[in-house]
């Protein structure tokens, strides 16, 4: 067998990796989890369970919904429809085809259903099976997720954002004293289910407990307790303890002494031991809990109390007459003086009363006696009347309603999470499978609420991340599915009851349209299904990691208060405290922290390293906010010695509630994995984040997402080390699927022969077609460029091609430019930016934007529209860019007003004049009965046509252009097929050759003789086909050849089949919208150079607008003649407090000067002045141990590495663990620069030095998506508003500039009467005046008259609508 690693050692791709000098001190023990796995796990693993056999699927997601909805039975229980299994077919179109054809990327869901028909004996009621039919039923197309975690819906890429909502369970809170004027705290409890009715319990100002269902009218809580079946006695015994008062003759009552019930107070009577008669404390003396415990310990069991002490106490059981057992007073009644006399008269020796004291109030007892419902039936009817007002209440209806509210699994669902939360809060041990309320739940909720009122326990914090959970894509779609299937269930039952069940098949019962429409509606219109932010790869990743508190079932902007939006201590390591929008959504839309992940219950977890006996281990544990509260957690930058032990006497740790305490090392349970785990991906890309003010860091993270991909991008010289991870996970770059060797590379595709051998030992081939100049969702340009060369050995997951905004596998949102901080002639006033002409000339910040234009030829009432070059009344000049079909050529340069696609529409017949008749007779019909409805380039757009797509309806004949495009595409498919086949053939025939050489021929083609021994030369004279005709003596070899042939034929057949399928799909015509015959899409690419008015920003929230482009010779320059690229205002720093940008500039200055130093060393090495050792020594001094892998390689590779860093040395300064000021100074010294980072600058205009030293350095700047070209426009003529007759406003309406109230004041202030009159009349809404003015301009006259503005007429009409008849009377002068 041929060794596959024949030229592997050629050159591993990893040699091209960029090495950064890392300033971080903390070793990473955990990798950043895949940044988009939150989306993929939720949908593919948990909801669809895609590549799992149906027998191994867990009861979650789609499986659990189908299990819960089925079986469906009809009303008479004769037919029963059961669910067996489900599976997905392969999608009809792949992702690329869907986005091109404006379709949704979805797979057909096939569900196997079993319909059982029963025979019921009318006499005995016994049932037996009559028949079973099983069938696979199509249930609609379910959207699939692309490999990047997005959905393609109607051709556009969308993201479903995860939602933060209140976790199901029970929550206790108080009103913070806001409701009652006295400031009394009113406690309440709320049970929030995942779906179903809400249950609220609340105290009122009089300490009576009420409950509400779904915020309806309130009822006494004891009504609820009675409704669940509790009697008065059970209620009182459950919520209160009882104590017995025993009669002591002539002395009073003896009662048990309980020290726990004693609070500090002065005694009103003596404290007497009932057993001994000793007086322990006199009246007026003070007793404390401590003293009470002392007495109890000394043997005080019972105390004597006065006779009248019983007055005001409550009975804990019925008071009965000892003689005849007659009930004298009911349980719970208060003992009055009269009742006490009766007790004395009847000589009742023992009286049981409730223990009611400051630690346990009489709230339940008071509520019980306020409530008029005395039994379960009355309670249920009372609840029924509140929920169904106006309906007659009978016990069956009331019982059924109450059961359905909280105890029916179909209508009420706490979810597993809700049950776990409920059990932990109420200290219960109910199975997690019980997801409805139980009687124990309700009893204990009331108990905990009363305990809170009594001062035991604490209320819940709703903003704690243990009480908020995340609903990701899978769960959101699961809920929609459930809605759809419940609707479908109703229609199934109706169809079962309507038809003849014996002849019906499962597919006749199921109407999949109901389900499809619900899912479609969610993806198209839900607030959480959003148009993906595709400006650059970072904005894509951030969008997928976003957490929104808005949306259905969430908060609304207007009602969200400050607490919900604020940063909470539990956000640490879970939600980024920095990245959130400015404006009304602040704090409601958040980003997940870099290392965070979501657990199976929907709670966010953060990783920590376990600490054992003060020793930090490499074990990483993920904790949720609830679990974290139990531990003491140290910070990642705690000092650790070589043995991994925590150093120092005390360690600063976080404990529950977000407080920090100092503890000894052995008490620490965990430490953070890395300081970076606190912030999100965007914030972790900001170097020196720790030196920036938080508000500016917020702007920095948000503005990085608006950076436009440039034609040429640079990775930042000063990075944070996360750049590579972001580029890899974003999906913008192309990753190798398997280990392999690069066989072919061009700008459009990469062909790799993989090294993972198949069963037969043959290689497979991976072909990567790169995206070229594709339009993103935000009209930026998606373009991929290969990074590999032929012969490179690539490993699985290596980056083999850069995408937009990536550079050598690292994210690169902007460019490194040389900046100087100094004022320059006022041109950098208020954050304006001054740029050098070089930046425009060399396309440093030039970006490509692609616009899509579409034209549809429809079938109209008067006949079909036609795409043609034959357009009436259009000159040949205007048609110069169109082909014979009427569609523009690719590569044509177009500007506003040019025709892109010629189209004519039939127009209705109108009566024609004799002259027209004559013209028609002479010149034919055509020109008259159609009107021009061509697609023109809109105003403000110009550029080059880069792509044209033509879609024709099935059955409509394709035009030449469509056929040409199709042919091009088929050639591309054929090339992919041929290249793959060629690689396989090369392998197969080399293998055959190895097998055949040295064998003796028995039979073969004409060119070979029987009995000859085969040589390599002999085989060279044969064609490939003749190899298979050779038969040799060795039977084993012949078997092996037979196997190879079978595999080869199978592979070839599979390739041909795949090619045929693709071609068939391409030629089959398209599914176009109703009435459309043909759709043409034209893509125009526009180059946007940097110009005044464009917005630029750094990574630290430092943003500004370009004010002027200055010739290079006028810009300040360095002593060596280098011209500064950008001049920024130093006054933008002190008040903004984003000092990180200055440290970045200094380190950037070190970067380019170190690069110069390395270049100088290389030059000297080439001139033989120094040896390689000096270069190695300098590299070690600069990079430290990072560089060892390079230094072990041959000399030429070390020199090649040095050349790669000739523009600048790349640094990584991780967030909160990066370079300190001293490190920056050390680097500047190493580069031979002044440690202040400041230099002498020369003014380009005068040639003189500036008065003082200036901070100069390399800084990373971004061009933002707010381009002046898309904002500024001008109008000469255009549309007018119908009512006011004033020009419309805004760029989209091609409107004018508003001359508003304040502008009028300005002209009035100057007394410019005529200018003002002109503004308010002919230039605005004087209809006649403006027509006359136009005429006079045409005639070349310079005079005009102002008439009455239309707004005056509008005002008069408004007066008339108020019944005031105002007339304008014009008197002649």
UniProtKB/Swiss-Prot annotation:
Family under the similarity heading: Belongs to the RNA polymerase beta chain family.
| Annotated catalysed reactions | RNA(n) + a ribonucleoside 5'-triphosphate = RNA(n+1) + diphosphate
Identify this protein by name.
DNA-directed RNA polymerase subunit beta
Report the source organism: Rickettsia africae (strain ESF-5)
Could you list this entry's UniProt keywords, alphabetically sorted: DNA-directed RNA polymerase, Nucleotidyltransferase, Transcription, Transferase
Q: Which Pfam families match?
A: RNA_pol_Rpb2_1, RNA_pol_Rpb2_2, RNA_pol_Rpb2_3, RNA_pol_Rpb2_45, RNA_pol_Rpb2_6, RNA_pol_Rpb2_7
What's a single GO MF annotation on this record?
ribonucleoside binding
- Extract the InterPro entries matched here: DNA-dir_RNA_pol_bsu_ext_1_sf (IPR042107), DNA-dir_RNA_pol_bsu_external_1 (IPR019462), DNA-dir_RNA_pol_su2 (IPR015712), DNA-dir_RNAP_su2_dom (IPR007120), DNA-dir_RNAP_su2_hyb_sf (IPR037033), RNA_pol_bsu_bac (IPR010243), RNA_pol_bsu_CS (IPR007121), RNA_pol_bsu_protrusion (IPR007644)
Tell me, in a sentence or two, what this protein's role is: DNA-dependent RNA polymerase catalyzes the transcription of DNA into RNA using the four ribonucleoside triphosphates as substrates.
Cellular component GO terms, alphabetical: DNA-directed RNA polymerase complex
A Gene Ontology annotation in the biological process aspect, one of them, is: DNA-templated transcription
Asked if the keyword Nucleotide-binding belongs to this entry, the reply reads no
Record EC number: 2.7.7.6
Subunit-structure text: The RNAP catalytic core consists of 2 alpha, 1 beta, 1 beta' and 1 omega subunit. When a sigma factor is associated with the core the holoenzyme is formed, which can initiate transcription.
């Amino acid at each position: 067998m041929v060794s596959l690693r024949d030229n592997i050692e050629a050159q591993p791709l990893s040699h091209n990796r960029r090495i950064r000098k890392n300033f971080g001190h903390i070793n990473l023990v955990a990798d950043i989890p895949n940044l988009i796995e939150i989306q993929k796990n939720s949908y593919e693993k948990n909801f669809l369970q895609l590549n799992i056999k149906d027998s191994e699927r867990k009861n979650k997601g789609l499986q659990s919904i189908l299990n819960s909805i089925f079986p469906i039975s009809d009303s008479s229980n004769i037919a029963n429809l059961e669910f067996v299994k489900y599976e997905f077919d392969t999608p009809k179109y792949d992702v690329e085809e869907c986005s091109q054809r404006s379709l949704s990327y979805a797979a057909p869901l096939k569900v196997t259903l079993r319909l059982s028909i029963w025979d019921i004996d009318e006499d005995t009621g016994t049932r037996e099976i009559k028949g079973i039919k099983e069938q696979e039923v199509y249930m609609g197309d379910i959207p699939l997720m692309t490999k990047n975690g997005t959905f393609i819906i109607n051709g556009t890429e969308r993201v479903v954002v995860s939602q933060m909502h209140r976790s199901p369970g029970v929550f206790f809170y108080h009103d913070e004293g806001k409701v009652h004027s006295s400031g009394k705290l009113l406690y309440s409890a709320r049970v929030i289910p995942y779906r179903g009715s809400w249950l609220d319990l609340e105290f009122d100002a009089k300490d009576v407990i009420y409950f509400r269902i779904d915020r309806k009218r309130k009822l006494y809580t004891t009504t609820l307790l009675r409704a669940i079946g509790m009697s008065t006695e059970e209620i009182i015994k459950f919520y209160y303890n009882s104590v017995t008062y025993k009669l002591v003759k002539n002395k009073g009552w003896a009662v048990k002494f309980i020290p726990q019930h004693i609070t500090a107070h002065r005694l009103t009577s003596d404290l007497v031991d009932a057993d001994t008669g000793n007086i322990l404390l006199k009246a007026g003396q003070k007793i404390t809990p401590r003293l009470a415990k002392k007495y109890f310990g000394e043997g005080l069991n019972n105390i004597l109390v006065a006779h009248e002490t019983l007055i005001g106490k409550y009975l804990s059981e019925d008071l009965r007459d000892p003689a005849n057992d007659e009930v004298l007073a009911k349980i719970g009644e208060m003992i009055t003086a009269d009742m006490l006399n009766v007790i004395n008269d009847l000589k009742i020796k023992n009286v049981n009363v409730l223990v009611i004291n400051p630690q346990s109030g009489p709230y339940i007892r008071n509520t019980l006696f306020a409530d008029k419902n005395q039994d379960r039936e009355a309670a249920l009817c009372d609840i029924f009347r509140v929920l169904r007002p106006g309906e007659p209440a009978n016990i069956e209806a009331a019982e059924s309603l109450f059961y359905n509210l909280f105890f029916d699994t179909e209508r009420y669902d706490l979810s597993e999470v809700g049950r776990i939360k409920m059990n932990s809060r109420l200290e219960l041990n109910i199975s997690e499978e019980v997801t409805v309320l139980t009687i124990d739940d309700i009893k204990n909720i009331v108990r905990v609420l009363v305990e809170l009122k009594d001062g035991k326990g604490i209320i819940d914090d709703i903003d704690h991340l243990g009480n908020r959970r995340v609903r990701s894509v899978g769960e959101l779609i699961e809920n929609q599915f459930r809605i759809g299937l419940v609707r479908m269930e109703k229609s199934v039952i109706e169809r079962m009851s309507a038809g003849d069940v014996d002849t019906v098949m499962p597919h006749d019962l199921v109407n999949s349209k109901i389900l499809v429409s619900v899912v479609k509606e969610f993806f198209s219109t839900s607030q959480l299904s959003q148009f993906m932010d595709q400006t650059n790869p970072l904005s894509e990743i951030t969008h997928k990691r976003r957490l929104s508190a808005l949306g259905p079932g969430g908060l609304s902007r207007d009602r969200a208060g400050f607490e919900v939006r604020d940063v909470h201590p539990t956000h640490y390591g879970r939600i980024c405290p920095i990245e959130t929008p400015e404006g009304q959504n602040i704090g409601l839309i958040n980003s997940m922290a870099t290392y965070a992940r979501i657990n199976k219950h929907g709670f966010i977890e953060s990783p920590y390293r376990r600490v054992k006996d003060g020793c930090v281990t490499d074990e990483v544990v993920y904790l949720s906010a609830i679990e974290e509260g139990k531990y003491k957690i140290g910070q990642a930058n705690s000092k650790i010695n070589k043995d991994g032990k925590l150093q120092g006497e005390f360690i600063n740790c976080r404990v529950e509630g977000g407080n920090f305490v100092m503890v000894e090392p052995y008490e620490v349970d965990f430490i953070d994995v890395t300081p970076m785990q606190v912030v999100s991906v965007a914030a972790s890309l900001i170097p020196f984040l720790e030196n920036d003010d938080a508000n500016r860091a917020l702007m920095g993270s948000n503005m990085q997402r608006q950076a436009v991909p440039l034609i040429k991008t640079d990775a930042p010289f000063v990075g944070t080390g996360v750049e590579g991870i972001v580029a890899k996970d974003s999906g913008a770059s192309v990753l190798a699927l398997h280990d392999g060797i690069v066989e072919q590379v061009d700008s459009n595709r990469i062909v790799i022969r993989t090294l993972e051998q198949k069963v037969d030992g043959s290689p497979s081939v991976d072909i990567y077609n790169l995206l070229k100049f594709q339009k993103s969702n935000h009209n930026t340009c998606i373009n991929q460029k290969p990074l590999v060369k032929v012969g490179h050995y690539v490993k699985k997951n290596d980056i083999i091609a850069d995408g937009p905004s990536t550079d050598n596998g690292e994210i690169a949102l902007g460019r490194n430019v040389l900046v100087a901080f100094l004022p320059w002639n006022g041109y950098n006033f208020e954050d304006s930016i001054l740029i050098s002409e070089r930046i425009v000339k060399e396309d440093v910040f030039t970006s490509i934007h692609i616009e899509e234009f579409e034209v549809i030829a429809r079938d109209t009432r008067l006949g079909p529209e036609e795409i043609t070059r034959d357009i009436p009344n259009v000159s040949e000049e205007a048609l110069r860019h169109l082909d014979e079909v009427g569609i523009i050529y690719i590569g044509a340069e177009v500007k506003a007003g040019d025709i892109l696609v010629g189209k004519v529409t039939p127009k209705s017949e109108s009566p024609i004049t004799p002259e027209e008749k004559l013209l028609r007779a002479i010149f034919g019909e055509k020109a008259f009965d159609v009107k021009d409805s061509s697609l023109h380039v809109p105003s403000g757009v110009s550029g080059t046509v880069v792509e044209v797509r033509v879609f024709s309806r099935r059955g409509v004949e394709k035009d030449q252009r469509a056929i040409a495009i199709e042919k091009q595409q088929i050639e591309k498919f054929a090339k992919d097929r041929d290249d793959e086949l060629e690689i396989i053939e090369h392998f197969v025939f080399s293998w055959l050759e190895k097998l055949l050489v040295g064998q003796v021929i028995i039979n073969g083609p004409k060119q070979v003789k029987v009995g000859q021994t085969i040589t390599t030369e002999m085989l060279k004279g044969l064609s490939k086909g003749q190899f298979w005709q050779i038969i040799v003596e060795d039977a084993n070899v012949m078997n092996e050849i037979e196997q190879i042939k079978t595999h080869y034929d199978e592979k070839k057949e599979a390739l041909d089949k795949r090619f045929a399928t693709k071609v068939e799909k391409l030629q089959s015509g398209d599914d176009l919208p109703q009435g459309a015959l043909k759709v043409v899409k034209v893509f125009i690419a526009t180059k946007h150079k940097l110009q005044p008015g464009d917005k630029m920003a750094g990574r630290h929230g430092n943003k500004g607008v370009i004010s002027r482009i200055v010739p290079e010779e006028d810009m300040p320059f360095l002593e060596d003649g280098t011209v500064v690229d950008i001049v920024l205002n130093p006054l933008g720093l002190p008040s903004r407090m984003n000092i990180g940008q200055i440290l970045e500039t200094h380190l950037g200055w070190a970067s380019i000067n170190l690069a110069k130093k390395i270049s100088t060393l290389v030059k000297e090495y080439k001139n033989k002045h120094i040896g390689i050792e000096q270069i190695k020594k300098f590299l070690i001094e600069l990079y430290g141990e990072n560089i060892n892998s390079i230094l072990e390689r041959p000399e030429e590779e070390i020199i090649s590495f040095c050349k790669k860093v000739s523009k600048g040395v790349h640094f990584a300064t991780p967030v909160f663990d990066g370079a300190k000021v001293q490190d920056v100074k050390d680097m500047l010294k190493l580069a031979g620069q002044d440690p202040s980072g400041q230099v002498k600058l020369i003014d380009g205009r005068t040639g003189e030095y500036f008065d003082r030293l200036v901070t100069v350095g390399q800084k990373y700047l971004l061009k933002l998506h707010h381009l002046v070209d898309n904002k500024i426009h001008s109008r000469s003529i255009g549309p007018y508003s119908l009512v006011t007759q004033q020009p419309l406003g805004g760029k989209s309406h091609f409107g004018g500039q508003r001359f508003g109230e304040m502008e009028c004041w300005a002209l009035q202030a100057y007394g410019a009467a005529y200018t003002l009159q002109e503004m308010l009349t002919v230039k605005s809404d004087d209809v006649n005046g403006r027509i006359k003015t136009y005429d006079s301009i045409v005639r070349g006259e310079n005079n005009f008259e102002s008439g009455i503005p239309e707004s005056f007429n509008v005002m008069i009409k408004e007066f008339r609508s108020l019944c005031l008849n105002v007339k304008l009377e014009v008197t002649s002068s």
